[in-house]
Amino acid sequence: MVSERYAALMESTAEDMIAEAVRAGRCRLDDLALHYAVAVTAEVVGLTSSPVPAMSRRLTRFFRQPPFDLARPRLGRTKRQLMGAAYNGLSPVLRFYLADVLPAVRDHRRRPRNDVISQLLDQGAGRADILVECVTYGTAGMVTTREFISMACWHLLEDDPLRARYLAAGQDERLGILHEIIRLEPVVGHLYRRVRDHITVSDEGREHHLAPGDLVDIDVRGANADPASVGTAPLELCPGRTLPRGIGASGLSFGDGAHRCPGRSLALLETDALLTRLLAQEPTILAEPSLGWDELFAGYRLRGSELRLGSA
């Protein structure tokens, strides 16, 4: 169980970071969320041989990509854009490998631990396989969790009754509130998949035939706001809403089936561990966040929210 295995790690990391923010009297929310998500996930994975702030900066560079269109040849990019994408994609991976992954692998060979890297080494995985896993955890497990923490905190700070309910609730109810927030505000707005076999899907009585190689755009935000799936008032935040059988509380925000995000429980639990401690400090908003859009994972980006903590 994630809650049992990593609870102490999430709680101690959150307490340390909130204590540091309280001493400073203020914090920038997206930076706090990033460093916290990176610190927790790094421990889970085993990327513990480099400083968290430096690794955080390297991970955010993964997302510096020119626009693209999956339905067009060469992603709709010019030759110059393709060259820029290759450089922007490969150079951060190389830096991440040399500064974070390789030192961690060396340390784990000398001293195995109970984490992902040690498990991969036990299975005979090579450095390339370990790098792929670390990049996957680094982008999905760290950077996207940063966005959800920021969005969930913003919702709770803007809604006094919801914040009071959250702080007074037990963990199950708090997680229910977070499920509803991420249903309404999925971090990844679209999932793109290539069809592997001939399939037929129906939509409102109409059949659509899909052939191998066809590109399917799964509109996560739209699906999560479908009254047929999530009930009445789909665009309102209603924790504990009654859902049909087979529909999860977070909708498609963590995917589904074979591609369902394996880190969904960790993401929600670490968000809860940080927000309960942050909101207990009764933060005051000094600067509202700016809302942007990230084409790479078709999701929102919140930056610049400043919070005052304590009496500072």
Residue locations for each model-derived region?
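Cytochrome P450
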Residues: M1-A312
